[in-house]
Amino acid sequence: MKHKYIVLSLSITISLCSCESILDIDPPTDSITADVTFSTSEGIRTAATGFYTDNFLNNLMYYQGLELYVSQLCDEMLARSGQFADLSQNNYNASSSYIPNLWDAPYSSIYGANDFLEHVEGSMVLPESELNKYRGEALFFRAYAYFYLVNLFGDVPLLTTSDVNVTAKAPRASKTEVYQQIVSDLLQAQVLLKNSGNGRTRISTDAATALLARVYLYTEQWDKAVSEANKLLPTIDGGLGSNYLLEAIDRVFLSTSSETILASNQEGFTGTGSYVGYTRIGNLFIPNERATYASYYFCDELVNAVRAEPEDLRNKWIGEKKGSGGKIYYFPYKYRNMMTPNNAASYESYVILRLAEQYLIRAEASVHLGHTQQAVNDINKIRERAALSPYGGSTAKDDLLMEIETQRRKEFFFEQGHRWMDLNRTGRADAVYSKTSYKKVNWKAFRSLLPIPEQQIGRNRSLTQNPGYESY
């Protein structure tokens, strides 16, 4: 059976143009429409390759979008132009222009995964081991998309089919139901991807395990969170039993980093001027040498938190730009190297999952399980890498959880929306944002969930708006 795909180099972006669908996404203007059939081995391989371009290179949310949008939702980053003022000041509504990106992009990924899974079912054109690898990848991408949807919007339509007659009128499913589907997809992916031999820039069993550990943490299944994290963490100092090790601060985001569990190869900027050769994410956030400002810059609250301990090596992840009038702009500097494909040692990858998170997942779950020493040990792994002294504070539950929150903030700022989701899942959003200088005026508790885009409400009568946004 043939289907229309949008071909980008060797990959595809599925075009979802039906006005009756829950999605209404225009194809890229530079796309070349072609027939790709699932009846050939090459067609299936091309479709599977397309997941990576669609999700990690051309997706309006996953590649740069999480950093651009979600870093402004939380207390991390501001934009100099007024375009995103509503984001950083938490004054968005259902008609805000950027909200659909955070909804449509994940659903585009989900639709693609569903369509792929449906049309390779029973296929005999590839060896079962290879087909299982592609199925596992599709399940991972579906789980990954739903993870962000449920953490940004709460209850969302749960779609496991590409049938527009179903998707067009699907109601919202509870967060519990969505998380159950995420867990199911990841458990299947672990099995299907076993012994697939995928590298760190392709979905693997370890990538599914890393995301599953995070999901178990978010759903407060502490024993399971520890169990999954243990599969990735070294069993003893030196790394026995693990393929991953914490890297030096300057090497965390390099393509050769042993800390990386999953990453996407970045494309260099090929335009003209002083940005030529920088990775795409560096091109967006690093100020031009001649600029008198940074277009996107960190808020004082974040800078003060990271620099509270001057010896903390994570200060290197914050760049400085002296602007007009002597104003200092602090900007993201985790991705800063020129793209040099002939020198892999200095080539950066866009990191999606890394080992440091697994230490802090195990630490947090261990606190809730009463395994205090394990929690302290894991906290100290992160502190030690940052050149900080061992944790010497109280080992009371609340104090340890606050230390973990602090380390997560300093470790994962400007990464994958961690800070926004951390404060929401722990119930700390109100306490923090109500005291943040540029957020406290507009902050209301209901804003911890984003509004469902108004065009989706108008298109699907089964959808209801999140509380608080009905009058906006």
Q: Where are the model-predicted features located?
A:
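Elongated scaffold/linker segments in the mid-to-C-terminal portions of large proteins
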Residues: Q83-F84, S97, P234-H371, T426-Y472
